[in-house]
């Protein structure tokens, strides 16, 4: 067991985003004594993205908490079975079971508004500029423009791919429901949070509470960190 006093934090982004989507959280957590890193990956294949998350785990001390946003929830569900992972935090995220894909989980609930504002080109799924209001509508106009300018488009078949691993069945989990989400159905978020028996928090945010309500998200991370620290000391 590591002698560190606080778990490391590994951020795992969703589609139409990258590691900078956690920029309002990272400096505070670093100042509070955590090793922090944001995984980066190509959104080309699910297996490749999971492998990238596991490789990123090796760059910080163990144990670690994985924090997954949106599609990042699918990644931490698979990568979180790694013994270096002590807990999982889901932010408005998917959390497929062993017999589900990201797409099959989304399909269990009504289609959200953002999917009327996408286009497929060159084998990738791009968000149109007018889709940002459905993705991050509670940010300033300047921030929304930055979100679009930096959004990473996934491979068109990414959400239909599967890998093994259902970490929320064996690791302590926390979940942040975004009540005003127009990208992932809030009903889906509440369903998966209940199914995994997660410690659940809810806030009236868009799909990106880590950008629109960073203090709320930081408080949840602190609560999860304190719980993991108690387990580390046991």
Where are these regions (language model features)?
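Conserved loop-alpha-helix segment in the C-terminal half of the alpha/beta-hydrolase fold
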Residues: 179-204, 211, 216, 223-224
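Histidine-bearing beta->alpha loop at or near hydrolase active sites
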Residues: 42-43, 204-208
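Flexible "cap/lid" loop of the alpha/beta hydrolase fold
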Residues: 81-129, 155-162, 192
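Gly/Ala-rich beta-loop-alpha elbow adjacent to hydrolase catalytic centers
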Residues: 67-72, 76
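Conserved alpha/beta-hydrolase catalytic His-Asp/Glu region
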Residues: 123-168
